[in-house]
């Protein structure tokens, strides 16, 4: 481990992956910039990254380094309910602690590069924006999943197809992560993890780059009469606020030379916050037959398909016959207009349905609006657990 102190942040810092192929270069000169190479070939040109405080102050531009520390990571991570029981995570890491009470970590693995900002001072901090202007080149092909809400782009279900487009020809609207860019020698996928008290990242194509955008902090909430779902009615002019020390989300740029490597990349899991709930033995993962997927439409049956006992009984039979561990009761099993999850509709005959599912060794998952269950979390979980959910 090498530690140095009180350096002016003008010199570039380089971090290289354990296999020596991937490297990240960080500069804290006029602006804070990060670039990425694979075997010496540029994947991402120098790209500005920063946090913006009140009055537009940039935390990392021309910042002075109080301490730089290099270290290597080599740890076995237990991964219950992952595609493997455990995996080994290796990385080389640079940790820069600044004189202004902030810091920055950059690490390189054989699977890509990641960075995160952090704060060491203990006062109240308001983040007005985060800068992430990733320069890949105007002609680079990107796969973007755009927001489906034109009126309120950041309020949507994060469900869309991916559009293949040159960055310079992309639509002028935000896309949600993951986003993948073809950089010729390899593909780079933008990801994030360990997001606590902070908005998720969107990106918008901007010439030759993908520029991050973030939802502003809610100022005033309201409820839709239908569903009882809360929504943001008015926002602040900042994106996050917190007290004391804080670690900001990891920004991950996963590097893959073969598309089959994409779903095997472990960086999101490895850099996520460690398990805080203790034992996970009570969690039973599994596949599910999902009513919403085909809108309850069943053909060739001798009953009226819909949100009712016979339909879900049919789903249970299907799940049992095909080795699926669960069925989902999506929206409609309780009256959405009343937004009371303690009162299932009579047509579902939930107690009978649970009994039938238990006989078939199929579990039931109940879908709800997020804030509706939050408001009765302990009561609802206790009630339905006692029923056999």
What is the meaning of each model-derived region?
Residues 1-12:
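Bacterial Sec-dependent N-terminal signal peptides
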Residues 5-6, 18, 359:
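Compositionally biased regions
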Residues 11-270, 275:
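N-terminal accessory beta-strand-rich subdomains and adjacent acidic, glycine-rich linkers
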Residues 141, 224, 248, 280, ...:
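Short, low-complexity intrinsically disordered segments
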Residues 239, 243-318, 322:
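An acidic-aromatic substrate-binding cleft motif
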Residues 285-389:
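Substrate-binding cleft of carbohydrate-active enzyme catalytic domains
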């Amino acid at each position: 481990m090498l530690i140095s102190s009180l350096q002016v942040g003008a010199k570039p810092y380089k971090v290289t992956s354990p296999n020596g192929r991937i490297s990240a270069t960080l500069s804290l000169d006029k602006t804070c910039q990060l670039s990425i190479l694979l075997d010496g070939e540029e994947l991402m040109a120098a790209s500005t990254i920063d946090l913006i405080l009140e009055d537009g102050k940039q935390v990392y531009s021309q910042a002075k380094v109080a301490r730089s520390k290099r270290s290597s990571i080599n740890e076995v991570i237990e991964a219950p309910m992952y595609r493997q029981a455990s995996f080994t995570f290796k990385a080389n890491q640079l940790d820069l602690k600044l004189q202004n009470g902030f810091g920055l970590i950059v690490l390189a693995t054989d699977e890509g590069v990641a960075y995160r900002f952090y704060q060491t001072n203990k006062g109240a901090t308001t983040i007005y924006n985060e800068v992430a202007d990733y320069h890949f080149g105007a002609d680079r092909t990107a796969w973007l999943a755009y927001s489906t809400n034109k009126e309120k782009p950041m309020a949507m279900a994060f469900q869309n197809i991916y559009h293949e487009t040159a960055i310079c020809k992309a639509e002028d609207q935000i896309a949600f992560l993951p986003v993948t860019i073809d950089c010729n020698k390899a593909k780079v996928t933008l990801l994030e993890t360990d997001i606590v008290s902070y908005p998720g990242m969107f990106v918008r194509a901007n010439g030759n780059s993908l520029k991050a955008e973030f939802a502003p902090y809610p100022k005033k909430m309201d409820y839709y009469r239908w569903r009882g779902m809360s929504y943001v009615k008015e926002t602040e002019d900042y994106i996050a606020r917190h007290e004391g020390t804080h670690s900001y989300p990891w920004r991950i740029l996963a590097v893959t030379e073969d598309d089959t490597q994409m779903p095997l990349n472990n960086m999101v899991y490895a850099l996520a916050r460690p398990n805080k709930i203790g034992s996970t033995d009570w969690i039973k993962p599994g596949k599910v037959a999902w009513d919403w997927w085909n809108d309850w439409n069943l053909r060739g049956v001798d009953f009226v398909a819909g949100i009712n006992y016979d339909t879900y009984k049919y789903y249970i039979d299907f799940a049992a016959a095909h080795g699926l561990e669960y069925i989902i009761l999506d929206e409609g099993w309780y009256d959405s207009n009343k937004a009371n999850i303690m009162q299932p509709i009579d047509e579902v005959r939930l107690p009978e349905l649970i009994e039938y599912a238990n006989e078939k060794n199929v579990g039931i998952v109940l879908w709800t609006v997020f804030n509706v269950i939050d408001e009765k979390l302990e009561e609802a979980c206790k009630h339905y657990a006692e029923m056999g959910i």
